[in-house]
């Protein structure tokens, strides 16, 4: 029985060997046929290369068991002495991307007439006392009117708000030039045409006031503010009754009303994110994503479904500093955006990021790039001082500083809201009109404080950085840091509250002796001289060594 089994096994093995021999013979025959074909091609066309076979591109290997594909428009199959060209249906055709047409900015514009604005808008500017555009306005207005998505970067107080409001008002609303608008009057009244998002209530209210000034008392209802701290029901009723063309608000309140179905923004043509570097923080992320999904659609983006009734929106990002996070957001949310600065307009694709996207820890180049943009955000006509004081004497130092510089409008910064009331109480006890502003104040209280501060009824406004972000008080001539900012970027945001629109401004940092090294570190990072000063006999006195630096 064992012998019979062995015999059968040998017979099967012999048959299998014969089968393998036949397979190898067929493969060899096929190989020699192809070799003869290649030799024939070589004799007729010279040397045998990939180019001679119309395969000029390099081969690319795929996974095991898959045929080798060539990165070209056609794949050549050889066999049976014939050549057949087969088109690769899965091959993607990459179109050459045309560079965005950049409008030459009018840096030498001496009047708003040169920017091509409607006559009605020019009359409003003249009525409000605006005669000469700033550098950033001369650069931004033509670019936005041309239809470019834009990132506007300029130092604090350079007129960035008007830089985007003017082109928007020239396209929509009662001041728009009729020949530019492609929408009927009924569409304008039923759909929101522009949305402006700000990180704080103060900045949102400030933008609304600027729009109302330009629109005038007759058309002021064409803009509606949607900010937190106010009655939501009244805001929804105002939306339904007034049918505004422009909405200005904070991310949370806008997203809240949008979820309730009371905010119709599919026909929105303009989306502005002011102080976008702050809006990119984690606590705004969910609301910002909802706004981006419901406010029009990105220009150049295809429809998500079979029918997409959303209008193409023009996206404008605004900030005094443009770190890599802003550049990344602009490329994701916009279509071929341009970077608008006070002296140039360039495609954002040409701006080199300072660090890779996935960098979890800031590198030296990333930190240097952020510091560089911070320096650019500072108003040019600022003087920076620091003085040493014990913690319990800081309020007296603040009072002596105000008297020595004869300051009329002062903003004093602290890091925590709970300490503001104590500082205000001590200043009031010493006969200096002051008030506090923080997040716990309601909308009415904050509006009242800001109005009194701008009118001069309040000399010192004590606040924290978040509440004062975007605060625009052109008359502010002194900023005092009663507590040190966390870094150079926060210092720049505080310092930007003074020296606005080319005015002179002073920044004084009050620190303890153990904190001087922090001031020196910020001085080195910003590349600006921080002069040590003292207040003697009602005057600000600078040491002889620092006087040499001034000269």
UniProtKB/Swiss-Prot annotation:
It catalyses: ATP + H2O = ADP + phosphate + H(+). The keyword Transcription regulation does not apply. PROSITE patterns: HELICASE_ATP_BIND_1, HELICASE_CTER, Q_MOTIF. Changing residue 228 to E: In ise1-1; increased PD-mediated transport, with higher frequency of branched and twinned PD, and impaired mitochondrial metabolism accompanied by a disrupted mitochondrial proton gradient and an increased production of reactive oxygen species. Residues 141-340 form the Helicase ATP-binding domain. Keywords: ATP-binding, Helicase, Hydrolase, Mitochondrion, Nucleotide-binding, RNA-binding, Transit peptide. GO terms for cellular component: mitochondrion. Its main location: mitochondrion. Residues 1-29 form a transit peptide. A motif (Q motif) lies at residues 110-138. Disruption phenotype: Embryogenesis mostly arrested at globular stage and cotyledon stage. Altered size exclusion limit of PD; abnormally maintained dilated PD at the torpedo stage and increased formation of secondary branched PD. Chlorosis. Altered plastid development. GO terms for molecular function: ATP binding; ATP hydrolysis activity; mRNA binding; RNA helicase activity. It is an enzyme of class 3 (hydrolase). Residues 397-548 form the Helicase C-terminal domain. GO terms for biological process: plasmodesma organization; plasmodesmata-mediated intercellular transport. It comes from the Eukaryota. ATP binds at residues 154-161. Essential protein required during embryogenesis. Required for mitochondrial metabolism. Necessary for normal plasmodesmata (PD) development and aperture regulation. The Q motif is unique to and characteristic of the DEAD box family of RNA helicases and controls ATP binding and hydrolysis. Belongs to the DEAD box helicase family. This is DEAD-box ATP-dependent RNA helicase 47, mitochondrial. It comes from Arabidopsis thaliana (Mouse-ear cress). The gene is RH47.
């Amino acid at each position: 029985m064992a012998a019979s089994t062995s015999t059968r096994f040998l017979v099967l093995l012999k048959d299998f060997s014969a089968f393998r021999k036949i397979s190898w013979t067929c493969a060899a025959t096929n190989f020699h046929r192809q070799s003869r074909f290649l030799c024939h091609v070589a004799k007729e066309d010279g040397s045998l290369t990939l180019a001679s076979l119309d395969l000029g591109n390099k081969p690319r290997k795929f996974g095991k068991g898959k045929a080798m594909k060539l990165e070209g428009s056609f794949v050549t199959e050889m066999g049976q002495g014939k050549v057949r060209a087969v088109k690769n249906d899965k091959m993607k055709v990459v179109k050459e991307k045309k560079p965005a047409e950049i409008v030459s900015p009018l840096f030498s514009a001496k009047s708003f007439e040169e920017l091509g604005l409607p006559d009605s808008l020019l009359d409003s500017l003249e009525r409000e006392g605006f005669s000469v555009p700033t550098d950033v306005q001369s650069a931004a207005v033509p670019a936005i009117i041309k239809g470019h998505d834009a990132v506007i970067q300029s130092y604090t107080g350079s007129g960035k708000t008007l830089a985007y409001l003017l082109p928007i008002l020239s396209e929509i609303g009662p001041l728009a030039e009729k020949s530019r608008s492609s929408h009927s009057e009924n569409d304008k009244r039923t759909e929101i045409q522009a949305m402006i998002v700000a990180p704080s209530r103060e900045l949102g209210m400030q933008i609304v006031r600027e729009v109302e000034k330009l629109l005038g008392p007759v058309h002021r209802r064409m803009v509606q503010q949607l900010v937190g701290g106010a009655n939501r029901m009244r805001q929804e009723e105002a939306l339904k009754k007034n049918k505004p063309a422009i909405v200005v608000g904070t991310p949370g309140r806008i997203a809240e009303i949008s979820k309730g179905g009371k905010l119709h923004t599919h026909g929105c043509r303009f989306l502005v994110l002011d102080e976008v570097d702050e809006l990119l923080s984690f606590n705004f992320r969910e609301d910002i994503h909802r706004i981006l999904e419901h406010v029009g659609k990105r220009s150049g983006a295809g429809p998500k479904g079979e029918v997409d009734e959303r209008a193409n929106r023009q996206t404008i990002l605004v900030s005094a500093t443009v770190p890599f996070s802003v550049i990344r957001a602009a490329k994701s949310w916009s279509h071929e955006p341009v970077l608008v600065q006070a002296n140039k307009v360039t495609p954002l694709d040409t701006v080199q990021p300072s660090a890779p996207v996935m960098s979890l820890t800031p590198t030296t180049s990333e930190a240097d790039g952020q510091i560089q943009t911070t320096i650019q955000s500072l108003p040019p006509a600022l003087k920076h001082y620091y003085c040493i004081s014990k913690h319990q004497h800081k309020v007296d130092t603040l009072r002596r500083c105000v008297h020595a510089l004869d300051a009329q409008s002062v903003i004093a910064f602290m890091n925590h809201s709970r300490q503001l009331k104590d500082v205000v109480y001590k200043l009031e006890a010493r006969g200096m009109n002051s008030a506090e502003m923080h997040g716990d104040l309601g909308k009415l209280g904050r509006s009242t404080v800001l109005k009194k501060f701008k009118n001069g009824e309040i000399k010192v406004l004590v606040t924290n950085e978040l509440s004062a972000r975007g605060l625009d008080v052109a008359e502010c001539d002194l900023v005092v840091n009663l507590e040190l900012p966390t870094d150079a970027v926060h210092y720049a945001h505080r310092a930007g509250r003074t020296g606005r629109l080319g005015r002179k401004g002073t920044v004084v940092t009050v620190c303890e002796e153990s904190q001087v090294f922090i001031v020196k570190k910020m001085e080195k990072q910003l590349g600006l001289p921080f002069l040590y000063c003292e207040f003697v006999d009602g005057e600000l006195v600078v040491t002889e060594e620092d006087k040499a630096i001034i000269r």
